[in-house]
Design a protein with these regions (language model features):
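Thiol-based oxidoreductase modules, predominantly thioredoxin-like and allied folds used
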Residues: 4-10, 30-33, 37, 44-70
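Short solvent-exposed coil/turn linkers within tandem alpha-helical repeat scaffolds
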Residues: 49, 96-100, 134-145, 160, ...
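Non-catalytic, surface beta->alpha helical segment in thiol-disulfide oxidoreductase systems
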Residues: 44-47, 78-114, 118
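N-terminal leader/targeting and pre-domain segments
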Residues: 1-22
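"A position-specific structural signal for the A-helix of alpha-solenoid helical repeats
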Residues: 113, 150-152
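Helix-turn-helix repeat elements of alpha-solenoid scaffolds
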Residues: 119-132, 159-169
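Loop/turn elements at helix/coil->beta-strand transitions in domains of secreted/extracellular proteins
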Residues: 22-26, 57-62, 81, 89-92
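Residue-level signature for tetratricopeptide repeat
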Residues: 117-120, 137, 154-156
Length: 187
C-alpha cells in the first residue's frame, strides 16, 4: 500500500546517512512560514498521489526551514522559497528549482533532478531513462527542452565524449524548441 503523504524527514544529517545507505538521491524542500508558494507546494503538489509515490519510492525527502535551518541553507546560497533541491549521497547539490511547481510539472522536475544526480555519479543510462520520461510524459512541455539538453550531455559522456552524439540529440532542441534558452546554450 502506498502512503498517502510524503515521508519527510527534518534532519539534514539523517538524510545524508539514509541516502548513502539506500543509494537514493536526496530531495530537499526549503520553505518558510507565511510563504504562499510554499503553502501551495505542500497543499497541492506534494499531496498529488503520483508525486507522493515517486518521491517516496525514489528519493530521501527532507523538509528544511529557511530560517530554522539557517546554517545548512546559508551554505547553499538560497534566497527564495520554496526551493526544491536535489543532492547526491554526499550532500552535494546537483539541481535546483525555485518557486511553486504544479504536480504535473513536478514529475518532470523529479526526473531531471534525479538525472542530474545520476550524471554526476556516472550513471548515464539511468539519467537517459529519466530524461526520456520527461519527453514521453510531456512532448511539448515546459521542461522538455531542458530534458533533451541534459540527455544530449548524458549520451555524450556515455558514448565516450563523442561530440556527434550530443549534436545529434541537441538537433532535436533546434528543431522543436528553437527559441528556448536550451537551443541558445549549444556550442
Amino acid at each position: 500500500m502506498t502512503p498517502d503523504t510524503i515521508s519527510w524527514i527534518a534532519n539534514w544529517d539523517e538524510a545524508k546517512v539514509r541516502s548513502r545507505a539506500e543509494r537514493k538521491p536526496i530531495l530537499i524542500d526549503v520553505y518558510q512560514d507565511n510563504c504562499s508558494g510554499c503553502e501551495r507546494l505542500m497543499m497541492e503538489t506534494f499531496t498529488d498521489p503520483q508525486v507522493i509515490q515517486e518521491v517516496n519510492d525514489r528519493f530521501i525527502p527532507v523538509h528544511l526551514h529557511m530560517f530554522n535551518d539557517r546554517a545548512i541553507v546559508r551554505d547553499w546560497g538560497l534566497f527564495w522559497t520554496p526551493t526544491v533541491l536535489f543532492a547526491d549521497r554526499t550532500g552535494k547539490i546537483r539541481y535546483e528549482s525555485i518557486n511553486y511547481i504544479p504536480a504535473d510539472v513536478m514529475l518532470d522536475v523529479l526526473d531531471i533532478g534525479e538525472a542530474r544526480v545520476a550524471m554526476r555519479w556516472k550513471e548515464m543510462d539511468n539519467a537517459i531513462q529519466r530524461l526520456l520520461s520527461v519527453e514521453h510524459r510531456h512532448p511539448d512541455g515546459s521542461m522538455t527542452a531542458e530534458a533533451i539538453y541534459w540527455r544530449g550531455m548524458a549520451e555524450y559522456f556515455r558514448d565516450g565524449g563523442k561530440p556527434a552524439t550530443a549534436k545529434r540529440v541537441w538537433a532535436e532542441i533546434n528543431e522543436r524548441f528553437p527559441d528556448s534558452i536550451w537551443a541558445a546554450r549549444q556550442p
